[in-house]
C-alpha cells in the first residue's frame, strides 16, 4: 500500500477560498467575452514579484473568457537607460520632453526591452502573448503636441497625441486567442494624413484610452503607484472610490501634475463610450483581480454621468 503526505488546509481557509470564488462568479459572468484594456506601468514594472503577479492576472483574465489588451509605458526603464547613457530626462506637466536623441532610446527600450520582457512573463504560462507597437499595422497615428504649464504653452519635442487607432491588428490577435502587448510609440501624421517618417513618444495612459475607445472595451484599467484619486491630497482618508465624468472634469485642473494624464485618460475613455475606467494601485499584488472580481473593488473608478453605482 502506498501512502502520500498531503498538504492540509484548514476548513475555514478552504471555505474562505470557496467564498472568494463565489464572489468572483457574477463578475466573471458579467465581463466574459468583453475586452479589457490595461495600462501597465509604475512600480509594477520594476518589482519582480509585482511583475510576475501582473502576468498571472492577465493570464487569469484570459482563461475566464475576458480579452485583455495590455498597453505599456516604460518610464522607469527609459529613465535608467537615459541615465546610463548620460542623457538628461525632463518632465513638464507630467509628460516627458523627448529630444531626437532620447527618442532613439525610448523606442529601443519600449519595443526591445519592456515589451519583450512582458511578453516573456505572460508566455511562461503558455503561448498567449504577442508583442506589437503603435507602428505595427498602422495601429496608432499621432500628431506632435505640447502641453500647458502655468498657463503657458510648452514644447515637449517628439511627443505625440494619438489621433487615430486602427484596431484591426489587435482584433486579429484577439480572434486568434492571443493577448496583445502594445508598446506606445507611434508614427507621426502630417496635415494631409500622410506619415512624416518620424516616430513619436506617446503617453501610455492616453494611448491606452484611445485603444480602449477604438475596441469598445468594457473597462480601462490604469495601474499606478498610488491607491487612487484623492479629493484632498495628501489626506489619504479622502480617497475617492467612484466619481462621474462630470465630477472628474470639474476636478481635473486642480490635480497634481502627475495624476493629470492618468485621470484625463480615464475621462477620455468614458466620454468615448468605454463603460468605466479605473485607477488601481499597481504596488498591490493581484490588484487587477481585486478590482475586477470583488464586490467592493479597489482604487478609483470613473463612470458615465448617467451611472453613479458600480
Curated annotation (Swiss-Prot):
Q: Which GO terms describe its cellular component?
A: cytoplasm
**GO MF annotation, one:** acetylglutamate kinase activity
Q: Keywords, A to Z?
A: Amino-acid biosynthesis, Arginine biosynthesis, ATP-binding, Cytoplasm, Kinase, Nucleotide-binding, Transferase
Catalysed reaction equations from the record: N-acetyl-L-glutamate + ATP = N-acetyl-L-glutamyl 5-phosphate + ADP
Q: Where is this site: Transition state stabilizer?
A: 39, 262
Q: What class of enzyme is it?
A: transferase
Pathway linked to the protein? Amino-acid biosynthesis; L-arginine biosynthesis; N(2)-acetyl-L-ornithine from L-glutamate: step 2/4
Biological process per Gene Ontology, one example term: arginine biosynthetic process via ornithine
Binding annotation for substrate: 74-75, 96, 201
Catalytic activity, EC: 2.7.2.8
Tell me which Gene3D superfamilies the record gives.
Answer: Acetylglutamate kinase-like (3.40.1160.10)
Identify the domain of life. Bacteria
List locations, semicolon-separated: Cytoplasm
Query: InterPro entries, per this entry?
Result: AceGlu_kinase-like_sf, AcgluKinase_fam, ArgB, Asp/Glu/Uridylate_kinase, Glu/AcGlu_kinase, NAGK-C
Matches recorded under HAMAP family:
ArgB
The entry sums up its family as follows: Belongs to the acetylglutamate kinase family. ArgB subfamily.
Its function, per the record, reads:
Catalyzes the ATP-dependent phosphorylation of N-acetyl-L-glutamate.
**Name of this protein:** Acetylglutamate kinase
Q: List the source organism.
A: Arthrobacter sp. (strain FB24)
